[in-house]
Amino acid sequence: MAKLIFLFATLALFVLLANASIQTTVIEVDEEEDNQLWRCQRQFLQHQRLRACQRFIHRRAQFGGQPDELEDEVEDDNDDENQPRRPALRQCCNQLRQVDRPCVCPVLRQAAQQVLQRQIIQGPQQLRRLFDAARNLPNICNIPNIGACPFRAWP
């Protein structure tokens, strides 16, 4: 009988330890996710909220078209007169290449959401084009190892 009680006590201790380690793992994953989100938010702000990408996304949402048709779109938000004015798509791609790979899709989602908040989007077709443009920018800009971003059209 004493052996049976000892066996059950040992088994209960193992279950308790396994449960505690599972909870610790979950907490560590949550902290890691929070750090990743914070790092991506910092990069979004550091790269001027990807204004060139926002401009490109906005034009694609409103007018559709292929990226090469919008290549001549010039970034208007250029306050520094010493910097040459460059097409919005090219400037967007340059900004995206400076973002850490794990943050590319999160910052593009933020850029699309900012366009959605600031601009008048008329109907579901423009909304779909807006998020399609943001989702496909890594492919358009040839960002290695990213492909299309996995977010959906509804923020």
From Swiss-Prot:
Positions of disulphide bridges: C40-C103, C53-C92, C93-C141, C105-C149
Signal sequence interval, chain numbering: 1-20
Alphabetized GO MF terms: nutrient reservoir activity
Keyword Transport attached: no
Propeptide span(s): 21-35, 69-82, 155
InterPro entries: Bifun_inhib/LTP/seed_sf (IPR036312), Bifunc_inhib/LTP/seed_store (IPR016140), Napin/2SS/CON (IPR000617)
Transmembrane regions: none
PTM-bearing positions, type Pyrrolidone carboxylic acid: Q36, Q83
Gene3D superfamilies on file: Plant lipid-transfer and hydrophobic proteins
A Pfam family annotated for this UniProt entry: Tryp_alpha_amyl
Region named Disordered: 64-86
Ranges of compositional bias, category Acidic residues: 68-81
Entry keywords, A to Z: Disulfide bond, Pyrrolidone carboxylic acid, Seed storage protein, Signal, Storage protein, Taste-modifying protein
Top-level taxonomic group: Eukaryota
Physiological role: Heat stable 2S seed storage protein having sweetness-inducing activity.
PANTHER family the UniProt entry points to: 2S SEED STORAGE PROTEIN 1-RELATED
Subunit structure, interactors included: Heterodimer of a small A and a large B chain linked by disulfide bonds.
Family membership: Belongs to the 2S seed storage albumins family.
Descriptive protein name: Sweet protein mabinlin-2
Organism: Capparis masaikai (Mabinlang)
